[in-house]
Amino acid sequence: MIKIAIIGASGYTGVELSRLLCNHPQVEITAVTSRQYAGVALSEVFPNLRGRTSLICENLTIEELCLRADLFFAAVPHKTAMNIVPQLLAAGKKVIDLSADFRLNSAAVYEEWYQEHSAKEFLSQAVYGLPELYREQIAKTQLLANPGCYPTSIILGMAPLLRAGIIKPQSIIADSKSGTTGAGRGAKVGSLFCEVNDGFKAYGVGRKHRHTPEIEQELGKLANTDFNITFTPHLLPISRGILSTIYADLNCEIEADEVQALYEEMYKDEPFVRVLPLGSAPATQYVRGSNYCDIGFAIDQTTGRIIVMSAIDNVVKGAAGQAVQNMNIMCGFAEQEGLEIVPLFP
């Protein structure tokens, strides 16, 4: 049994962490923080938790928090995390940061895309928390950088191809669609019902989305070379889910069954990656509420391109579920503990 605290429990990621951890047999949630809802029951803020938790949201100092828990989920905005993580690490605590503050290896790249980094010395200590690629490192780390939602779907979709060296890395085009929870719970005009309902739009077009360097960093490691991709995110009028359609030029002649074998071999022991039968395509409704990533592909022999499709729930495998999966690895628990959830359909 481990005592955990959720810093920033009033956002979508925070409530999803609470939902998942309420079902975890090895976890005791000892604190949930929220400045906005301090003194309010978490189940009052999120009625879906009624009868499952009696926790009260609190506005605690780091010193007070360190007396409560051994492992911390930092579900706070960028810049905020880098201000609190060093204090938690200095107290000997384990930290899973769900912001982007420790995902990028280079402080210069982070500052180009986000803002000044005030804890640069910790970047080299952080492990990128994609279990399918970094399980051994995750098991040993004190500071884990939980991946972004779009990067998770794209990296898992492309990893077998890049490892096998059968595509031209610089040809990759990632076309991703996300539900509105990806924009967070804060009030924004672009997230209002009338702005989103019955519509579908691209945003962050032309190398403007902050997940771009994260995707390139990890794909570059898989390919053993630095390169740039074209990444265009879109906003869907649904609550949760990401579908990434990723295109790349093949650099050799290869049959679909050979590519299928590459995917099946890489992910055969992965509990949360489901490689679909040849000819099948993933869909967001079949991973909803779960920690699964469903992957399918097709080859266009006329153009010499492969089209990979990857579906995840952006709030689960794209955020809170992956964080719990990482916690399990860091703490030596069974990796599926608390996450063996059948996707919600319809």
From Swiss-Prot:
Which reaction does this enzyme catalyse, per its entry?
Answer: N-acetyl-L-glutamate 5-semialdehyde + phosphate + NADP(+) = N-acetyl-L-glutamyl 5-phosphate + NADPH + H(+)
Note the SMART domains from the entry. Semialdhyde_dh
Q: Where in the cell is it found?
A: Cytoplasm
Assigned EC number: 1.2.1.38
Q: Among its keywords, does the record have Lipid metabolism?
A: no
What is the first-listed, main subcellular location in coarse terms?
cytoplasm
Q: Which GO terms describe its cellular component?
A: cytoplasm
Record's keyword annotation contains Cytoplasm: yes
Report any one BP term from Gene Ontology: L-arginine biosynthetic process
UniProt cross-references to HAMAP family, sorted A to Z: ArgC_type1
According to its UniProt entry, the function of this protein is described as:
Catalyzes the NADPH-dependent reduction of N-acetyl-5-glutamyl phosphate to yield N-acetyl-L-glutamate 5-semialdehyde.
What name does the UniProt record give this protein?
N-acetyl-gamma-glutamyl-phosphate reductase
Gene encoding this polypeptide?
A: argC
